[in-house]
Each structure stands twice: as structure tokens, then as C-alpha cells.
């Protein structure tokens, strides 16, 4: 999601002026900007059972360039935990009122033999794991491997890397400590549950915007250039942002 800087005079719209358009104004709809994403393979796209469930929350973070002032104003002294932003495909697995489901970023998917999301869920016994845990929860993470975003990490098989646990009944994310306990419980029960790599902790009051962006220049799982770092508040995981590695953006041009 890169942009192009142009002088205001370039835009031939009557409403586009210094008076009507201020810093931070979202011009997506006015300019007709649309996001283009690589088309998914049939094994990833799957067959839809329905739209992404309303009782879940989609995974998304604001870029730090768009929210640094607000973060420093409202959360300056809070401790944020940083994890590697993996370049894969968003995957959500849930158990609600005895119903088990698997979702891509936008869809609740039917189980079919060739769907990669469901195959990974079955391989890792996620249904048994969530039933053993005994609560209405969803796990959200990155699906990585062959055929996904060019498989930058050069993984031989498809793997799931957890980054969030969503409490369906409470409609909130687990805190970092609660997520850690969840992962430990699942592993102690014999289930395989990989997490995204954790890298550092910061307090926003101690870093400038430029410093936070520089910290995103790190290695990924296997690739020398990570996509970036996602930071989540240790107190409230719904407070989060991402810092994208400029080296990654240059490679993606």
C-alpha cells in the first residue's frame, strides 16, 4: 500500500483545495482508489459457506505513519510488544456454541478436500484443540507456505503462525499474557501451535516515528528482509499498529 506524492494543482476536482482537504483526510472514496491484491489460487480461495462471521473481528492494523500522533497522545507510556509481520494469508479458526469453522480474510469457508485453510486446520487438529480448551474463542494467524505470496520464507509445507486470540463471548482480544497462557495450555495438551516470532518491546514515548520505522528493518523467519513489525499493547491487544520495513516496500515495487 504505497502512495504517490503530487501537488494539489494536479487534481482537477472543484472540492480539492487547501480549504476542503486537510492533513489526515481520507480521500479513498473521492478519488476512486481501489486496493489490488494478487488473485488467490483455487486451493486458497475455496468455496464460501458465508461472509466473514460478524462475531469475529478482521485482522488489520493501521500503519504507524497514520496514527503516530494519536498513539503518542493516548498510549505514550504503555508497553507494546512487537512481533514479525509475516507476508502470508490471514487465517481465522473458531469454535462458537459447538460449531467449528475456518475462515480466510473475507469468507467463512466450506470444508473441501483441496482447500488449504481447512487442510492446515485438520493437520494441526485445531478443532480438537479448541474443543479441549472449552471456550468460545477464535485463533487468528498467518497461513504461510508454497503458493502464498511467493513463499518468501521458503517453507516446504503450509504452516499457521498465531498472532491473536479472540474471545467470542467477551468480544475482545486476549491480552499478551492471556495469549501466552492459551498457547502454553494447548502445547501442554499435546497440540502443535506455532506463533509469529516476537522481537522487542517499546514505549512510544521513547521513540520518534523515524525510530520506530528503523526498528522494522529486521530479518524474518528465513528471509533476510521482514515485511515489518506489528506492535500490540500489553494491556489491550485491540490497540495496535504496524511499522512496514522500507526495504520490503522497495522489493515489492
Placement of each model-derived feature along the sequence:
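Core nucleotide-handling region used for phosphoryl-transfer chemistry
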Residues: 1-253
